Amino acid sequence: VKYISKSLTSSGAFSHIIFLFGPTGVGKTELLLDLDPQRFSVINADSIQVYRHLDIGSAKASKEVQNTITHYLIDVQDPWEQFSVGDFISYADKACEKIHQEGKIPIISGGTAYYFKHFLYGLSEAPPSDEAVRAQVSALIELHGNEWAFRRLSEVDPVSAERIHPSDMYRVSRALEVYEASGKPLSSFSLPAEPRYGMHPLVIGLARDSALLRSRIGLRIKKMFDEGLEDEIRGLLRMGAESSWPGLQGIGYKEFFQAMEHGEWSRSIIADQIERNSRFYAKRQMTFFKSFSEVKWMDPADKQAILTEIAQYCCS
């Protein structure tokens, strides 16, 4: 499937493109503010920040930041709707085209690791979704529960289970569908060997000392509560939010709904759970990011070195 127009490939819109990734709380947004907004625009690669109404819990770039440097793929979907990796590729391709037409360079920035890999290589050759199989898998999950679904995935496709977060039921369900439909694990269907359209991005990975990252995650979660995360959740509930909404599977939201299912709403307990989940997720992110080839790992505290790396790439 092609997600990009002929004009994009012929105009060399992928001649310069930058990937900027790292775990949650590492400091990606602060770095973006040091870039020249006349030369760069940002394409968001966070699977929760694509949703409207999910601002504080997703640590979405503030309106001030978005007004400082142009951002794409923020607030493009309602939280009750699915947003697939194929959707991301389609949106990101169009954003790249627009950015290059403006004479700028796109920076794809975020923490959803598989967005980067699939944007670079495209989708795997896994069989397409089948309505009957999907209904069968959905019925089993409805009967046995989400924890059972992830245990089942761990049995039939441990490689995918290592890559997929247990609460990401869209991807868990999809992996189970592929297994039921083909008898083969999703992980056995490989990505194309070559990048799409001859893409050769500058790939910058941001990494910090683990103790410092843990501290930053803790401060970030405190800031979320101080900025009104609980009020944001109450606003979603007034909208009729349900725990099954795809946008609410993200860390910072699912913990509230899990607490309510147990008849509890303790700020301290929920905050602790969000922090634990965030730390665990950061470790999983780094594991995935380290599988990426040709990553230039850099300390976000050394902004000048990063900006120099970007400048040299843009002049190449």
What are these regions (language model features)?
Residues 1-316:
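Phosphate/pyrophosphate-binding catalytic cores of soluble transferases and nucleic-acid-acting enzymes
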